[in-house]
Every structure is written in C-alpha cells, then in structure tokens.
Amino acid sequence: MSLDPALMLWSIPMKSTRYMQFALVSLFSVGLACAKADEPAKPSVHIYNWYDYIAPNTMSDFQKEAGISAVYDVFDNSDVMQSKLMAGRSGYDVVVASGDLLPNLIKAGVLKKLDRSKLPNWSHLDPEILAKLQSNDPANSYAAPYLWGTTGIGYDADKVKSILGPDAPVNSWDLIFKEENLAKLSQCGVAMLDAANEVVPIALHYLGLPYNSRNPDDYKKAQELLLKLRPHIVYFDSSKFISDLANGNICVVLGWAGGVADAQKASELAGNHRNLVYSIPREGAPVWVESLVQLNDAPNPEQGLAFINYMLRPDVIAESSNYLSYPNANKDATALVEQKIRDNPGVYPSKDVLDTLFPLEPLPLKIERVRTRTWNTVKTGA
C-alpha cells in the first residue's frame, strides 16, 4: 500500500485517534528510509496496525534500541485486515487484531503461538484482562493484549442540553435509540460508526435481546429499529466524526472513547473549546481488546517477538495510552498514564460500569452474513 503521508491523511479512516498531520508524518517517516547501499541490511520487522494507533515516537525508539528496521503499514477496517491475513503471504510479522477475530484466525491456522520464553515483559500484563481474553484465545496462547476500550456516546454537552434540556439522557442509549430524542438532535447532526459488529449488537442489547444472538429473527427486529432511526443519521463513518465533532458539524456520535478524546483535543487546538463528553450508557456497552499477534508465515519471527516484548514494557505502552486516551492491559503501566486520563470515567470505567460491559464475540458464518445484510440494509435505508 502507498505510504505517502499526504495521501494517507485523507484516504484512510482511523480506528480511533488523531488526524493531525504532524503525528501522521512522524509515524510514517519511521523506518522507511532505505539503508545505504554499502551497509549490510539490518534485521527487520513488518507491523500491520490500525491507522495512527500507536504513540508517534514508539517505532523510532524501538529501532534505535533494538537495532531492528521497522516497516509500519496500516489498515482502514478489520474486514480488510482479516481478508489479507486469511489469504496468506501477507509479509507481516506482527498484527494488531481485535479479540472477536481471534477464534477464526486461530482456527484457520493463521496465527503462531507466542514463545513466552522470548517475552519476559509478559509478567507486566493484568491477570484479569488475560483471563477475559481466554474466551477468544484459550490459555492466552496467541495474543498479547495491547489496548482496550469501549463503544459509547460522544456528544457536545452544550448543544445537546440546549435541545433536550438539562435532563437529557446523556448516560443512556435512549439519547440515540429513542426516536423522539434523535429526531430533535438531528438538527445539530448525529453520526454512527460504520461498524456492523458493534452497532448491531448495541441495537440488539437495547431491545433486550442477546447482543451475540444466533437467531435471524432477532436481527430483523434490530433492523426495524435502526431503519426507524436512519432518517435522522447524517452518516455512518468511523473516522469523519472526529473532525466533525471538533468543528461542530455534528453534536452526537455513537463512537469510540479515544475518538471523542481526540475531537476534544482538536477542538482546543483550533480554539473552539467545545464541551465534548464521552459516556458509557448505563444499560451496558461493548468492550473490546486489541492484541498483538504473530503470523504463522511471518518472515521475521524473532524480530516480531522482540517488538511484542518491547510493547509490553510499562513505559512504552503508557506512551500510547497517553497519546490515544485508551487504557492498556499492563498492570504496571497504570501509574505512568497521565492522571487526567486515569481520572476520566469514560476511559477508565469504575468497577460498577465494567460489570455492565459486554465483549464483542465471533458469530457463526451464517449469522455473520445475516448481520452484514442487516447493516447494509440500514446504511442504504432500503
């Protein structure tokens, strides 16, 4: 794929984070310069990650410390990534993958078991998060948890309360899924992620149905609900909401915590100083964990393990948490995360809130197709 920063800035959606040019340029300038012809080639590692989903200095620091040349490519959505890995011969050593994708990747023989003897920094990982990951990765054999987060509601507090009043249900999915509220909020713009594996489970959960339902009839009910809301949604997109929330083009989004945090920072940088807030609805919301995995056909497995071990260092992963406003899975890194991030309940939920969260899970292929058709119907409004 092209790694021209000027092109990438506008052509690749973000998982959840910054869109400022300085970060992009610093990220993609790392490790891409060719070695001098008269110098022996350095060992290398090829990384495949979400766009701008790592601290901007991490790759350069790793190269300096490890003496390993790094090539860093990005993907725009998990379907693209999964398809490339399933096809084989991707050329990547380490990939960042969502927990709900792990079972299919493991079953297909795409992933390589991690050699823990080469990962001394594994000891820093949080046992509770490792235990939760075992539903998708038994015995934590294949995945080293990286960052985690939730999918909830981002909103402009001033605009929402001016429209719905001081008692606006900002801590409930009613803000979006109750049509009378959404119709009123449409005057200032409401957007949703373009993510069937997150939005459809939320709709099912809101209806009191299993979020990971295997019943096709449940998806008809979710589709009916979402189609009622469709006329009031300005667009479905997983990156545009960040700039639009920052500049006031929208006032509500069903989105990610880190994206809303970035919108607030962008707003302040532009001098808008909007009162942007992220909330985890009291009814419950999806929680996801992104992990570092190694491919079975990785061309540089030793260098891949060196990179994973580097990312498991508390000081290293804390930099990404501080940059992205996402919690990490490293129990010894928490104290290194900025206090204002740790104190944000939308980023670091309380135990009571954590108990309401539900994990994204893989579905049987037949039901996955039903969910995809449901989502496509909702997006087109047909």
Task: Give the residues covered by each predicted segment.
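Conserved C-terminal helix/tail region of periplasmic/extracytoplasmic solute-binding proteins
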Residues: 243, 351-382
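Short beta-strand->loop
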Residues: 112-123, 270-286, 295-298
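Extracytoplasmic ligand-binding site segments that recognize negatively charged/polar headgroups
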Residues: 96, 102-232, 239-246
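A ligand-binding cleft/hinge motif common to bilobed small-molecule-binding domains
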Residues: 101-104, 252-272
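Early extracytoplasmic/lumenal segment of secretory-pathway proteins
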Residues: 37-108
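A bilobed periplasmic-binding-protein/Venus flytrap-type ligand-binding module shared by bacterial periplasmic
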Residues: 154-159, 205-209, 288-300, 319
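Periplasmic-binding protein-like
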Residues: 219-228, 234, 272-293
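Mature extracytoplasmic/periplasmic domains
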Residues: 290, 295-356
